[in-house]
Amino acid sequence: MQVQRPPLEAWYMNDSEEDQRLPHHRNPPEYVTLEKLAALGVIHWVLDADNHETDPELSIIRKDRGYNYTDVITVCPEMLPSYEAKIKSFYEEHIHMDEEIRYCLDGSGYFDVRDPEDHWIRIWVRKGDMIVLPAGCYHRFTLDEHNYIMAMRLFVGEPIWTPYNRPQDEHPVRKGYVHQFLQPELLDVDMSISA
């Protein structure tokens, strides 16, 4: 069941080295549309996180996309072993050989992805947001100032979460992503920064 609430928020980040958990809006803020995210291969749904175990919409998505394995991870200082090391590794810019699929069941955090000009776009994921980052997409994750997220991780087949830290421009999966999503002649959405 689609949940009615404000849509996913995303914006271009400033270059500040301040706490990674801050929003890092540019001044003035420069928001990014869902269409721009889709042009980068980022897919998004808003689902009923309170009823995720019986949600028919989630079942349809899982069936259609072949997500046959799930687990739930809680990221917060009290629940995640080696918390500081994990947060640091999540925030290292990296790619995966497969999609990264996360469904926020509670809490919130940020996924950052690169645009075609290598600028960071920050995506604020909140309760009910399900997001898919395509294989080969440079990205990173951090908690926001609430320091808490509970997320369902979804996989096709065996659960594999192997990050390949940047630079990976010669990796075949990265090349495939660039060819599919970042070739200027293939972009049908204006990716220019808008005020």
UniProtKB/Swiss-Prot annotation:
Record-listed Ni(2+) binding positions: H94, H96, E100, H139
Reaction(s) the record says it catalyses: 1,2-dihydroxy-5-(methylsulfanyl)pent-1-en-3-one + O2 = 4-methylsulfanyl-2-oxobutanoate + formate + 2 H(+); 1,2-dihydroxy-5-(methylsulfanyl)pent-1-en-3-one + O2 = 3-(methylsulfanyl)propanoate + CO + formate + 2 H(+)
One of the protein's GO biological processes: L-methionine salvage from methylthioadenosine
Keyword terms, alphabetized: Amino-acid biosynthesis, Cytoplasm, Dioxygenase, Iron, Metal-binding, Methionine biosynthesis, Nickel, Nucleus, Oxidoreductase
Database matches in InterPro entries: ARD (IPR004313), ARD_euk (IPR027496), RmlC-like_jellyroll (IPR014710), RmlC_Cupin_sf (IPR011051)
Protein name, as recorded: Acireductone dioxygenase 2
EC number(s) from the headed UniProt entry: 1.13.11.54, 1.13.11.53
